[in-house]
Amino acid sequence: MNFNLRQAIMANIQGSNEQEVEATIVDAIQSGEEKMLPGLGVLFEVYWKNCNEQQKDQLCEQISQGLQ
C-alpha cells in the first residue's frame, strides 16, 4: 500500500474556507503536538505556491526575524 501523506492532508482540507483554515492553524500551534506539523507544512506549501516573489521575500524576512 502506497500512502501519500501530502495527498491525504490535501484531501482533508480541500474546500476549507478562511475561518476553517485559520482555526486549523491556531489549533495546530496552540496544541503544540508534533503530529500537526505535516499539516502545517502542507498549508505552508499551498501558501508558498500561491505567493508572488515579493510576498515570498516578506515571508522569509518575517520568519528570519522571528528566529533571532
From Swiss-Prot:
<dbReference type="GO" id="GO:0030435">
    <property type="term" value="P:sporulation resulting in formation of a cellular spore"/>
</dbReference>
<dbReference type="Pfam" id="PF14098">
    <property type="entry name" value="SSPI"/>
</dbReference>
<comment type="similarity">
    <text>Belongs to the SspI family.</text>
</comment>
<dbReference type="InterPro" id="IPR017525">
    <property type="entry name" value="SspI"/>
</dbReference>
<dbReference type="GO" id="GO:0030436">
    <property type="term" value="P:asexual sporulation"/>
</dbReference>
<keyword id="KW-0749">Sporulation</keyword>
<protein>
    <recommendedName>
        <fullName>Small, acid-soluble spore protein I</fullName>
    </recommendedName>
</protein>
